[in-house]
Amino acid sequence: MKTLASRKSLWMLLFIVIFWVSFTVFRNPVKLRTMFKLPVSFNRWNLVMGPSCPAVPLNLPVSPKETELRIREVLEKLDKQIPPRPFTHLNYTTSATHSTATILNPRDTHCVGDQLDILVEARDHLGNRKGYGGDFMRARMFSPALKAGASGKVTDFNNGTYLVSFTLFWEGTVSLSILLMHPSEGVSALWRSRKQGYDRIIFSGQFVSGASQVHTECALVLNSSVELCQYLDAQDQEAFYCVKPPNVPCAALTYMQSKNKDVSYLSQQERSLFERSNIAVEIMEKSNAISVSKCNTDTAPVKEKCKLGMVSAIPSGHVWKNAWTPASCSLAPIKMKDCLRGKFIYLMGDSTIRQWMEYFKSKVNTLRSVDLHESGKLQHQLAVDLDEKISIQWQKHGYPLIGSLVYSVKEIENIARIIDRTGGEKNTVIVISLGQHFRPFPIDLFIRRALNVHKALQRLLLRSPDTVVVLKTENTRELNSDVERFSDFHGYTQYLALKDIFQDLNVGVIDAWDMTVAYGINNVHPPEDVVRSQINIFLNYIC
């Protein structure tokens, strides 16, 4: 018994040592190289002091030409879906009250599995038919008593008419909703506004050097004649800037926080479109319920288990008894701890993926948090179960990070660099979520970041094709948020861009956008039912 106990202790010690080395390399390769007197190469954010428009290095690791062309291609696709619309007066914009929604081929009872189509005719506040499309609508069917819901597909014919299609997933009384989130004139104004500047958010950087603490202005773009610190990701040519404090080195940047700036690129008349009373207005009449029955007694065909690389249907699934049921595949019941056994899971992104970390820790009681000696809400998190060889880490993505709370930037870096440092193998799982913090900035910033992550994943899957990669799209958020900065329209365009960029990779996609629409959630941090459904799909992808 003593020999057995000794062996177990030895194996646990060996695992701790291996895990510590792996985690140190993952988190701070420079520290490890220094410890073992290896040559140091700063492969993360390079610090450069220079003028407000620093020269681009001549010898780039990768030519940016291909990236620029791809950014333009994705932008052009979005531009075609969001053409400029004239705005002269509120009366001539789309009115949910005056628009009509007509069920095509109505029946007393509809059948489970059928498609229900609704024709929407957009009209302005004077009752006139609209001659063009572009309205931002959100369609949903739901049965509160059954805790069931699903999104609807909206097809824009670009002539003022729309086809809203619902798949009738369940039987019972089903309510229908078609919300006019923003009229086409408002959508056009938001799209134009988003392209106009990086200054809607003010960043304040805190430099700590000895006993000295200095705050200066920071930004993704700084138009300043004073000396700047440039924090450059040299490989992907993404940079963040701060005004350099006198007699303080750029490397002393330690903390960051942000706040909204009182700036708008909308006219006073356009801003009236985004008053709360004009957002998410119902188009359907009050008598919007239909009856659905199970007309066919045949057994439903067995769907294959959800796996990586599957093309998602539209809608991607539905909610039933507060749990998610995918449309094109099936979810097997999986014991979480058994599935996580022996796996290294890296959660990278914003606080919506940090919710996963919190969920794992609350549901797997043998996970122990490791003190990484950081402070603040956005500190990196690590939880391990040494007996089961489980390691789960959450790490925030690189700039921009928006928040009034102070957060540390000592270890901040872009996700692409973390991926490049990851060896990968069949028990390594990477989960990425980007979106919410990019909404207030021109969308080319988000597209560039997504493309750089895509390239890093290509490199990872080339050297280690067994590595499991999962993307969680962003979700809907509060309707009363600052619309010009955080509207769900901005999130939806990013959602479309992300799906376009990653469609060629063999990765698992968790369609958090469609899920939160189906649940009827308007919260940047969805409740536990939604998080549980997301993680249930994730477990089916990896086990």
From Swiss-Prot:
<protein>
    <recommendedName>
        <fullName>NXPE family member 4</fullName>
    </recommendedName>
</protein>
<feature type="glycosylation site" description="N-linked (GlcNAc...) asparagine">
    <location>
        <position position="223"/>
    </location>
</feature>
<feature type="signal peptide">
    <location>
        <begin position="1"/>
        <end position="26"/>
    </location>
</feature>
<feature type="glycosylation site" description="N-linked (GlcNAc...) asparagine">
    <location>
        <position position="159"/>
    </location>
</feature>
<feature type="glycosylation site" description="N-linked (GlcNAc...) asparagine">
    <location>
        <position position="91"/>
    </location>
</feature>
<keyword id="KW-0325">Glycoprotein</keyword>
<dbReference type="GO" id="GO:0005576">
    <property type="term" value="C:extracellular region"/>
</dbReference>
<dbReference type="InterPro" id="IPR057106">
    <property type="entry name" value="NXPE4_C"/>
</dbReference>
<keyword id="KW-0732">Signal</keyword>
<dbReference type="InterPro" id="IPR013783">
    <property type="entry name" value="Ig-like_fold"/>
</dbReference>
<keyword id="KW-0964">Secreted</keyword>
<dbReference type="Pfam" id="PF06312">
    <property type="entry name" value="Neurexophilin"/>
</dbReference>
<dbReference type="InterPro" id="IPR026845">
    <property type="entry name" value="NXPH/NXPE"/>
</dbReference>
<dbReference type="Pfam" id="PF24536">
    <property type="entry name" value="NXPE4_C"/>
</dbReference>
<comment type="similarity">
    <text>Belongs to the NXPE family.</text>
</comment>
<dbReference type="InterPro" id="IPR014756">
    <property type="entry name" value="Ig_E-set"/>
</dbReference>
